[in-house]
Amino acid sequence: MGDKKENSYSHILKYTGLFGSVQGLGILVGVLRNKFTALFLGPSGMGLLSLFSSTISVLSSACNFGIPTSGVKFISEKEHAADESQSEKADIAGAVLLVRTYSLLAAFFGAIVCVLLGPLLNGFTFSWGNHTLHFILLAPTIFFTILAGGETAILKATGQLRALAMQASLLAILLLLVSVPVYWIFGERGILPVLFILAFMQWALNFRYSRRVVRWGVNMRKMTLVAGFPLLRLGGAFVLSGLMNSGCEFLIRAFLNQQGDLEVVGLFNAGITIVFVYAGMVFSVMDQDFYPRLSGISGSRKNEESVKERNLCVNRQLEMNVLLLGPIVAAIILGLPLIIPILYNAQFMGMLQMTQLAAVAMLFKAVYLPIEYLPLSRGDSRLFLIQESFCVILLIVCEIAGYQLDGLRGVGGGIAVAYAIETIAVLIFSRAVYGYRLSALGFRFCIFQLLILLLVLFLVFMVSYRDWLYWLIGVIIVLMSTSFSFRKIRKLVR
């Protein structure tokens, strides 16, 4: 009965709202921060910020030993054992000790790698000037970014979701209070200090809460380090996956910088932020609620009952994703001519059509993302990596081809095409390996919302947003999508 309740539409809606609202608060604060950042840095400064942020993401993903993800599973196993046997509660502290020890080692490793690769990163990223010192100065930021990842894993594994929500809210507010005056006074020279302050505050806030759960400590003895090898083996697949995704982001930005300039990178990054962050609130529930529920379904790949239960879990999450995201994406596509000047300024209107096209990708992501969790939930790391490799290569090829064909607008089209192909590929792959079948209900929801988005795209490319017909027809289409989703959700949760 408990499993059925956890997989119910009402449960999914409840926790999507909970985690989405937490992220929504961060986004609202982020809107103000991005507005002032764009004002004080401009498109070129935003491009520079994007390149340094991508570098931090790539190096921290490559050097963190996969602890932010594998650490959750590693500690959670001990937590579950402790629930069954009081004598095993000490294992939780031991698991946390290992996570913190390897997080510290990974942090030093990441900082050293950053220093050593500084000249290489400069040559690969910039075709002008010498930014080697800037890349080297990112080392402390990477150090605290990796440390923060370890503390986040501890909070997730021990069920401290309220603390995580509080930490995220405080971090967003503090970053706003710090970054705006720094960018105002120092301009582009303030980018590196702000990135460091962000990483340090994230670690400090996480540590503030995690040390209440388990007292801080590390152990560098050989016996302790050897005991942590399972943690490293588990994290290997996550390291490669994170590295591929971060590397994809870095390669695309470096390509745009080489083929265009920092302004192009800044416009691209701003558009991607709107699409993937603001439209992605619905996805915030996936790691926190959906993945644990899916992982809790036992049985082999071919076990008929297990296959049915997994299909039910995935399809209900997918259906709710599509119903919630359809109206949001339609409204974003229609409202971007107003959203961009509010979030940034008039200089960023060059990303309008790119962002409108890329937004369609979010509907495809709503479909394939729950399905892509199947290999992870089964512990099939090799299949997960094969799937991720295909998707990353596909995205790089489509974005580069799109830019060559139609500039920045082509990049947006390339993203939408890549996500559409990825959806089809994931459906075929998951059916062959896991026996997954998309529900008829989910298929109908997808087709309806996709047609709505195509209607909105036709409107925004054929009618000027300065024309009143643009807004009249657009609002009617968005209301159609909203009404459809509202009626279907109300029916499902009854």
Q: Model-found features: residue ranges?
A:
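Helix-loop junctions and terminal segments of transmembrane helices
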Residues: 64-83, 157, 215, 271, ...
